[in-house]
Amino acid sequence: MATVNQLVRKGRQKPVVKSNVPALEACPQKRGVCTRVYTTTPKKPNSAMRKVCRVRLTNGYEVSSYIGGEGHNLQEHSVVLIRGGRVKDLPGVRYHTVRGALDCSGVNDRRQGRSKYGAKRPKS
């Protein structure tokens, strides 16, 4: 326990909180251009071909971003919006592309959880 005199001299130090998404620079989303669109395999014990793109952001950062949902229309030079949110089984992928924004289309024939995939309400 610190004495009153020690606290007067120094004060309590606040712990420095490190961001999980440094490339966003405290913004909710950032725009960027795809430099590479590819698939990669997840860590054990999972098995899949996960769709990922490398994005050069407007602030100069280059990051890997996961493309969620079934099927996408992204290719090199597509302009995308990215948000934070890591993919647990893909090391180094700390961002998600926002479906239905800018050049990234929404998921076709999506009926549930549509807002997360930029899908319009189906005509019933």
Swiss-Prot record:
Amino acid composition bias (Basic residues), ranges on this chain: 113-124
A single BP term in Gene Ontology: translation
Keyword annotations from UniProtKB, A to Z: Ribonucleoprotein, Ribosomal protein, RNA-binding, rRNA-binding, tRNA-binding
Region (Disordered): 105-124
Disulfide feature: none
Oligomeric and partner information: Part of the 30S ribosomal subunit. Contacts proteins S8 and S17. May interact with IF1 in the 30S initiation complex.
Domain of life: Bacteria
Entry protein name: Small ribosomal subunit protein uS12
Similarity remark: Belongs to the universal ribosomal protein uS12 family.
Summary of the function given for this chain in its UniProt record: With S4 and S5 plays an important role in translational accuracy.
GO CC terms in record: small ribosomal subunit
Molecular functions (GO terms): rRNA binding; structural constituent of ribosome; tRNA binding
Pfam family, one: Ribosom_S12_S23
Lineage: Bacteria, Pseudomonadati, Pseudomonadota, Gammaproteobacteria, Alteromonadales
